[in-house]
Amino acid sequence: MSAPKKVVLAYSGGLDTSIILKWLQTEYGCEVVTFTADLGQGEELEPAREKAVMLGIKPDNIFIEDVREEFVRDFVFPMFRANALYEGLYLLGTSIARPLIAKRLVEIAAMTGADAVAHGATGKGNDQVRFELTAYALDPAIKVIAPWREWDLTSRTRLIEFAEQNQIPIAKNKRGEAPFSVDANLLHTSSEGRVLENPGEEAPDYVYQRTVDPEKAPDTPEFVEITFEKGDAVAINGEAMSPATILTRLNELGGKHGVGRLDLVENRFVGMKSRGIYETPGGTILLEAHRGIEQITLDSGAGHLKDSIMPRYAELIYNGFWYSPEREMLQALIDKSQEHVSGTVRVKLYKGFARTVARWSDHSLYSEKHVTFEEDAGAYDQKDAAGFIRLNALRLKLIATRNARVKG
């Protein structure tokens, strides 16, 4: 394959992606286009523009975009309709952001006439897979460059030397090894590596950046009411909000009460186990509330089927198959299940916990007259249960009879 002439780089403005930018220019002699996404990571992004210009990028080749609303509306919310948890615990905060970034890389490549895209994911992690599967799903002819799999800059010392040789500014706090690496967006903050690599040691307090220590959270609980329409949150405490605004507000509430901390050893798609510290305050509240509204609006058959496919759906997202036909097929089933998932849930926030305490809906299937312990005025005839039990017991009785005969 011929060397690329123009490359769109996923660019944060940090030291590593600045080194990648310069490496692409020197190694491939290509024109570089940068894309920086505002996913709600909480960083000022204009310095990324200034740094790109300083490194020789034409102003027209610098793309900085606020994609927070698209991220929550088109990626986070569809995932939350499924109550997706990878390995029963992980809310997929990093996994769900990668398809959007890769999608924009491919779209910008088409807009600018670039023939390749590049990312800064290492050769050991899942992100390289997620970026590249998305790129190839959207443009089979695109070339993907993964510098960490190609170059010889295999140590922090070599990276610093390359930066100094190429006049790339290095902040004083970037010269040494960071105690851990951080990835953040509006859904979560992920911390991995170095001081966290020994799973037998508790993570130090300074790792947590988005949530207060639950033991130091307010001594008074706080209640929040979340309104849903067809499975998506649309209002908080009666106030209609955009998707990104809802998640931002829930992050503030959850962080204040120490909600959403997770210390997890997970199975990476590439074959190894890794330890991560995840903070997902708003997402944890949202998941709890969504489950709460489903409890009264979703039929048991549909709900149990939906629960059974959730692990596979979550695994597809974790492994990078957002744009696969099987994920889209499952999404259609999940979205169908949400047609009546509308109503309001009250969640109690207290010292690390988010717990549903009330829920109501015009679409509710809950019938108090059927379930009451008091007189039900004929709504339910308890004698009907006898035939129901006899029919369900029939096969068990036949099995027991057979077993007794065989043993005899």
From Swiss-Prot:
- Where L-citrulline binds, per the record, is at Y90, S95, N126, R130, S181, S190, E266, Y278
Q: Where is this protein found? A: Cytoplasm
Keyword Ligase (UniProt): yes
- What is its pathway? Amino-acid biosynthesis; L-arginine biosynthesis; L-arginine from L-ornithine and carbamoyl phosphate: step 2/3
What domain of life does the native source organism fall in? Answer: Bacteria
Q: What EC identifiers does the entry list?
A: 6.3.4.5
Amino-acid positions noted as binding L-aspartate in the UniProt annotation, renumbered to this chain:
T122, N126, D127
Q: Which residues bind ATP?
A: A10, Y11, S12, G13, G14, L15, D16, T17, S18, A37, G120
* A Pfam short name: Arginosuc_synth
UniProt-listed InterPro entries: Arginosuc_syn_C, Arginosuc_syn_N, Arginosuc_synth, Arginosuc_synth_CS, Arginosuc_synth_type_1_subfam, AS_cat/multimer_dom_body, Rossmann-like_a/b/a_fold
Specify the protein name: Argininosuccinate synthase
Phylogenetic classification of the source organism? Bacteria, Pseudomonadati, Pseudomonadota, Alphaproteobacteria, Rhodobacterales
Q: Which gene encodes it?
A: argG
